From Swiss-Prot:
GO terms for biological process: fatty acid biosynthetic process; secondary metabolite biosynthetic process. InterPro entries: ACP_syn_III_C, ACP_syn_III_N, FabH, Thiolase-like. This is Beta-ketoacyl-[acyl-carrier-protein] synthase III 2. Pathway: Lipid metabolism; fatty acid biosynthesis. PANTHER family: 3-OXOACYL-[ACYL-CARRIER-PROTEIN] SYNTHASE 3 (PTHR34069), BETA-KETOACYL-[ACYL-CARRIER-PROTEIN] SYNTHASE III (PTHR34069:SF2). Its main location: cytoplasm. It is found in: Cytoplasm. It comes from Streptomyces coelicolor (strain ATCC BAA-471 / A3(2) / M145). Belongs to the thiolase-like superfamily. FabH family.
Length: 330
């Protein structure tokens, strides 16, 4: 499914904000509970450390802080849509987004959760952009937030070393496809025949993942999706200033970039410091890249993600030059 931006009406990114827990857990600490060590983890994932929430801190807590940061980044204090992409809602029912909106003082805003696992943020970006373009709303807060420490078995080496907790958000506003920050094209897809590759079994409490199978599917699918999205945006891949992929595994990012023939300096990666933060990974990477001066106003960004479901999605965005607001909480 594609959502191309027709005419001149469109959505633009005007702010970006993040929230990371204060607690840092490095590979040595993780290794104490597992048959592994820093060298093994780093060589296979590129991860050196991850963040973990304190007991009692929820996905909603992180989402509120990241959402407030994105609003502050854009110089706004309100919006009419809050879309929360997450696999770890605070409750099974009701959705977490309405409570997040209320805590942000947005009591009349539409709000709902979206579940597309690690593709969730790109799905949310696409849905919110389409709603703005259609005139359903004027300003939308898209938040990706996950607390995977709540669904990962600490004794499972295949998942315990991979995931971290965090949240990231962007503010989208009605604008023009020629404006800085424009979301030019998004593309989404899924394949339910692979739903067992990343799953929480019906009778289980923890996430399970078939890593080698996920790697193969992710590399092929992310490259195809990114290539198609760039073409629909009217870009040659050589025109892409920064490739911002889901931070699942450094090997995946490197392999996808090679297939797209993008040089390493154009690949945004912060997985070493935050690990795989699921729906939060792309906005966290965007904020870090902006804070470090790796992306600037007018840069062409190619975003792509792959997650459980199986789901995937990509977006072509012209960066607005928004200054990120990056916060922490316990």
């Amino acid at each position: 499914m594609s959502a191309a931006r027709g005419g001149r009406a469109g959505a633009v990114v005007t702010g970006v904000g993040t929230c990371l827990p204060e607690t840092v857990v490095d590979n040595d600490e993780v290794s104490r509970h597992l048959d592994t060590d820093h060298a093994w983890i780093h060589s296979r994932t590129g991860i050196e450390r991850r963040r973990r929430v304190s007991p009692g801190t929820t996905t909603g807590d992180l989402a509120v802080t990241a959402g407030a940061a994105a609003l502050k980044s854009a110089g706004r204090d309100d919006c009419d849509l809050v879309l929360l992409a997450t696999t770890t809602p605070d409750r099974r029912c009701p959705a977490t987004a309405p409570r997040v909106a209320s805590r942000l003082g947005l009591r009349a805003a539409a709000a709902f959760d979206l579940s597309a696992v690690c593709s969730g943020f790109v799905y949310g970006l696409s849905v919110a952009s389409a709603m703005i373009t259609a005139g359903t709303c004027d300003r939308a807060l898209v938040i990706g937030a996950d607390v995977y420490s709540s669904i990962v078995d600490p004794d499972d080496r295949g998942t315990a070393v991979v995931f971290g907790d965090g949240a990231g958000a962007v503010l989208l506003e009605r604008g023009d496809t020629g404006d800085p920050g424009a979301v030019l094209h998004t593309e989404l897809g899924s394949d339910g025949t692979g739903d067992e590759l990343i799953t929480i079994p019906p009778d289980g409490a923890y996430l399970t993942m078939r890593g080698s199978d996920v790697y193969t599917r992710a590399v092929t699918t992310m490259a195809e999706s990114a290539r198609s999205t760039a073409a629909h945006a009217g870009w040659d891949l050589a025109d892409v200033d920064a490739f911002v992929g889901h931070q699942a595994n450094l090997r995946i990012l490197t392999s996808v970039a090679k297939r797209l023939r993008l040089p390493p300096e154009r690949v945004v990666s912060n997985i070493a410091d935050v690990a795989n933060t699921a729906a939060a990974s792309i906005p966290l990477a965007l904020a870090d890249a902006a804070a470090q001066g790796r992306i600037g106003s007018g840069d062409r960004l190619l975003l792509t993600a792959f997650g459980g479901g199986l789901t995937w999605g990509s977006a072509a965005v012209v960066w607005s030059g928004a200054e990120p607001v990056q916060d922490q909480r316990s």
